[in-house]
């Protein structure tokens, strides 16, 4: 099975590092239009303020479902089989 992985490349600029993301035109990949993703305008403020704003706009007010208890790790299962 072939799995393709897209890895962002870190590019050194004059005095800062920035991620270089390569975008591919959707028309070359498929005939169906991609869904419009919601965008969030963020201007200024500290990192904490920005994350608070992101959380307010994206996090659900209540969990959609209760998560199941954690399963035993794969290594434990392998040890039991030996």
Swiss-Prot record:
Residues 55-64 have a biased composition (Polar residues). It comes from the Eukaryota. Residues 55-82 are annotated as: Disordered. This is Putative uncharacterized protein DDB_G0279885. It comes from Dictyostelium discoideum (Social amoeba).
